[in-house]
């Protein structure tokens, strides 16, 4: 079977029982890939949320069905999503390879027949960060000894190797790995594994007798002389791959990045291997990044650069001269050349061909791309009180005087100016805003003089002193609004504007996703949202899942009381009493879920053998519950699980449907289990090997995580996800956020954490951007968290086909908070310019339709320009087929090539 036939077979399969099926656009992409991949590598640049991963799984399966092997390089946080998609697509894969120790553990079994070497796996998931090893110095020798051991054994294979000392398992695993790799490579001296080992030995142990100092630990450090050779040695143990899939291929573009080292040194390619890069943003900040992305798949970029640059120049000119015939003709010629130059390597489906976007265009009478609407949350400096107006003006003044002061003052002044609009700079100056300015200034001047005296040769000049005094004056003015010291960020105009916009969305029953960069303002936003919602619920007699008020929350509650204009003074003791009474009512409601909890879950399992991992954990849960039959939610596993299920499922459990109870328990298990012991893959007989799994210990870990998650002090209306948020907590937050009627209603995510790898689209279509970004690709990724297949927006379009007014057609909304009169207004303007360039190259939107609304006389020219934009969409299928949405019941009869059943599982 060749690749085209295998891909066709995968595309034509009926829906699997779990609903895994390619839609029409994905099937067209798969056929186009099957035609082009034998000739060269490919970039799959589908827009965010259109199912690139599923296409890649289908391609991987087709390659495996043809007898090939596949390496899949993914960001560290996406292993779970990839494993899930591979499992649904019936592609067997070990756990995500993250470390050298995990690499060696493939040879941990004492019985050689039960070992699972990486080179025997048909598909291997590898973390982008796999090659970021900490080596050299005092690090353990086993971390780098693979290279000298492999070279010695390959040079003299008959010599063998001695067993390691008893109990030295690292070196024993290393010895087994070396023996296994050499044995496998020896089967075919012309194969890639043998060729790489021969080259390594030739480089490290040349015939003239020289040695490369293979036992010098320092040479294996990052940048060390032997580091690349060790990377190639490790790659030999992974075996040769016929297809290398690179997820998020726009990441780590530098030559020295971990991903680049994986591609250049670690991953061993077969002679006919191809690379397939997945990225929604092959170009981010400038058109030259096309060349970097193309280089990732081994494309020849020499002739492409000029074509890309000419297209970028033509786009800029035609935007400035829309009515100029020559500019339009030059643009159309450049667009055609751009498309022709990249078409052999690039496939991209965008929302122009999405049926929901097309339905929106018909309903709204607008271009399809208008389904996304930008709605600025404006902070108008002119409407602020005098203190804030002075603060904004003072921050801008710092741009003039800060550069005249010394480096320390200049840095402080610049930071305040650049971050005034989003609250970050204000947070860093809180201490200065809450003490006696005059007394503290004297102390600070004394400290500076004392610190400078030993090293300063010349006294400060009058100019330096005056510049510093001017900078200090403006800093004092900028921080004056916070002199009260009661949680200054809670009254920051940008945060208040965001709160009002967020609450307007939650009041209509939808959720809001917020992105920002700086932790302090994000935490202040979460605290304020929770405090306001808590007071609102108490006033309305609605349940609030919190029994005590903690000291850290009190400033936010005071601010919320003032902002909501609640009657009378705020007494903490009265508030805590109201919380306790409210919580008792909520606990009484939870009680009804606890009594029959175990029996209802067990009834839900009846006859279902599809998830033995979760079933074994349920049995462990039952044993733990029997040991602790009494107690509060803090101590009783039954009460804890009931609380968690109630929080995640809410009214779904009121029907007391055993299937709903069992499904809710499985969700808890999948979200809180360690991914290193996640649902174990089944072998051919349908049985899982759990002999070495301590399910009681595994359940205790889950119980601890549930305790941490559901016994938090805060109520949870809004939650914060930042860099230190644990993976299992992120999964729980994702699970709950995708449920329409449970907390959190607002998820506030730090940009670096939440913009990739999370699906947050099932109950949310609104994204608030609290802090400005410079990179439009980042904003695309952020909006893409809610703009995905199966989103709330799609369901609203489906339900609202007969909407009366075009302006009422549902849209996905992204809402930047723009503080007018501060530097972030400039930031947003620059971002918009870059975003327009990105859309011209990837989205087919060279000139915004908003311009046509303002200038109808330009409408036909704008349509002409946008219609000529490069389009890399694969051609549609020639025959109509039933919608993938309707086919959900067909059984899967996938077949793999013959394998030893013992090699089909690692988990």
How would you label these PLM feature ranges?
Residues 271, 763-764:
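Short, structured coil segments at secondary-structure junctions
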Residues 1-44, 50-739, 748, 753-758, ...:
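Helicase motor interdomain insertion/brace
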Residues 758-762, 778:
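A short, glycine- and acidic-residue-rich donor-binding loop in the catalytic cores
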Residues 767:
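Substrate-binding groove of N-acetylhexosamine-processing glycoside hydrolases
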Residues 770-773:
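Short beta->alpha connector loops at strand-helix junctions that form conserved
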Residues 775-803:
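Conserved SF2 helicase motif VI
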């Amino acid at each position: 079977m060749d690749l085209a036939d295998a891909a066709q077979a995968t595309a034509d399969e009926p829906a699997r029982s779990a609903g895994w099926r390619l839609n029409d656009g994905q099937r067209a992409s798969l056929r186009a890939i099957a035609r082009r991949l034998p000739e060269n590598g490919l970039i799959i640049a589908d827009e965010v949320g259109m199912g690139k991963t599923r296409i890649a799984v289908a391609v991987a399966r087709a390659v495996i069905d043809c007898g090939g092997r596949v390496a899949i390089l993914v960001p560290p946080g996406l292993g779970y999503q990839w494993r899930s998609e591979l499992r649904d697509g019936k592609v067997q894969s070990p756990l995500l390879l993250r470390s050298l120790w995990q690499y060696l553990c493939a040879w941990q079994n004492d019985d050689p027949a039960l070992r699972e070497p990486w080179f025997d796996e048909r598909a291997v998931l590898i973390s982008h960060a796999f090659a970021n090893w900490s080596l050299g110095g005092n690090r353990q020798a086993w971390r780098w000894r693979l290279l000298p051991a492999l070279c010695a054994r390959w040079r003299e294979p008959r010599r063998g190797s001695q067993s390691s000392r008893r109990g030295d398992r690292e070196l024993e695993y290393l010895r087994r790995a070396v023996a296994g790799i050499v044995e496998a490579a020896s089967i075919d001296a012309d194969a890639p594994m043998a060729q790489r080992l021969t080259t390594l030995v030739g480089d490290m142990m040349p015939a003239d007798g020289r040695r490369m100092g293979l036992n010098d630990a320092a040479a294996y450090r990052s940048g060390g002389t032997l580091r690349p050779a060790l990377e190639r040695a490790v790659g030999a143990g992974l075996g040769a791959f016929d297809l290398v899939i690179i997820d998020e291929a726009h990441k780590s573009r530098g030559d020295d990045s971990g991903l680049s080292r994986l591609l250049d040194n670690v991953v061993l390619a077969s002679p006919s291997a191809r690379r397939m890069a997945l990225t929604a943003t092959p170009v981010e900040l400038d058109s030259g990044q096309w060349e970097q992305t193309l280089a990732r798949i081994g494309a020849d970029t020499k002739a492409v650069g000029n074509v890309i640059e000419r297209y970028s120049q033509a786009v800029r000119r035609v935007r400035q001269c829309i009515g100029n015939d020559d500019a339009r003709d030059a643009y159309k010629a450049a667009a055609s050349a751009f498309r022709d130059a990249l078409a052999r390597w690039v496939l991209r489906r965008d929302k122009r061909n999405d049926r929901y976007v097309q339905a929106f265009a018909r309903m709204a009478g607008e271009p399809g791309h208008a389904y996304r609407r930008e709605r600025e949350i404006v902070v108008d400096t002119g409407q602020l009180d005098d203190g804030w107006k002075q603060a904004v003006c003072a921050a801008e003044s710092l741009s003039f005087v800060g550069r005249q002061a010394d480096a320390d003052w200049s840095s402080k002044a610049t930071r305040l100016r650049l971050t005034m609009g989003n609250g970050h700079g204000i947070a860093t100056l809180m201490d200065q805003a809450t003490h006696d300015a005059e007394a503290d200034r004297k102390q600070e001047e004394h400290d500076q003089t004392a610190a400078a005296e030993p090293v300063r040769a010349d006294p400060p000049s009058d100019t330096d002193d005056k510049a510093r005094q001017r900078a200090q004056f403006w800093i004092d003015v900028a921080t004056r609004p916070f002199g009260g010291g009661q949680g200054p960020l809670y009254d920051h105009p940008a945060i208040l504007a965001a709160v009002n916009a967020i609450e307007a969305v939650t009041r209509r029953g939808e959720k809001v996703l917020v992105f920002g960069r700086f932790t302090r303002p994000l935490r202040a936003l979460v605290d304020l949202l929770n405090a306001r919602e808590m007071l609102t619920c108490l006033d309305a007699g609605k349940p609030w899942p919190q029994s005590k008020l903690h000291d850290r929350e009190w400033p936010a509650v005071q601010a919320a009381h003032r902002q909501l204009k609640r009657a009378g003074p705020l007494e903490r003791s009265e508030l805590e009493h109201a919380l306790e009474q409210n919580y008792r009512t909520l606990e009484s409601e939870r009680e009804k879920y606890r009594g029959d909890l175990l029996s209802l879950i067990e009834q839900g399992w009846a006859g279902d053998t599809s998830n033995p991992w979760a079933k074994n954990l349920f049995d462990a849960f039952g044993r733990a519950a029997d040991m602790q039959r009494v107690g509060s939610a803090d101590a009783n596993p039954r009460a804890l699980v009931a609380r968690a299920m109630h929080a995640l499922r809410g009214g779904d459990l009121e029907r007391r449907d055993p299937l709903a109870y069992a499904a809710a328990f499985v969700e808890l298990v999948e979200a809180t289990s360690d991914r290193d012991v996640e649902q174990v893959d089944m072998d051919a007989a349908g049985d899982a090997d759990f002999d070495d799994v301590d399910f009681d210990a595994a359940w205790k870990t889950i119980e601890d995580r549930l305790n941490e998650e559901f016994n938090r002090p805060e109520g949870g209306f809004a939650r914060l996800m930042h860099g230190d948020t644990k993976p299992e907590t992120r999964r729980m937050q994702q699970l709950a956020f995708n449920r329409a009627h449970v907390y959190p209603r607002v998820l506030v995510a730090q940009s670096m954490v939440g913009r990739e790898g999370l699906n947050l689209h099932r109950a949310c279509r609104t994204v608030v951007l609290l802090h400005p970004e410079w990179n439009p690709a980042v904003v695309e990724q952020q909006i893409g968290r809610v703009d995905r297949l199966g989103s709330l927006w799609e369901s609203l379009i489906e339900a609202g086909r007969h909407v009366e007014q075009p302006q009422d057609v549902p849209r996905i909304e992204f809402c930047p908070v723009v503080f007018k009169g501060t530097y972030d207004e400039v930031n947003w303007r620059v971002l918009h310019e870059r975003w327009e360039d990105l859309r011209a190259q990837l989205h087919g939107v060279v000139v915004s339709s908003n311009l046509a609304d303002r200038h109808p006389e330009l409408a036909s020219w704008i349509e002409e320009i946008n219609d000529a934009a490069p389009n890399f969409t694969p051609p549609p299928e020639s025959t109509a087929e039933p919608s993938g949405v309707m086919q959900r019941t067909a059984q899967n009869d996938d077949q793999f090539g013959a394998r030893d059943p013992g090699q089909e599982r690692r988990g």
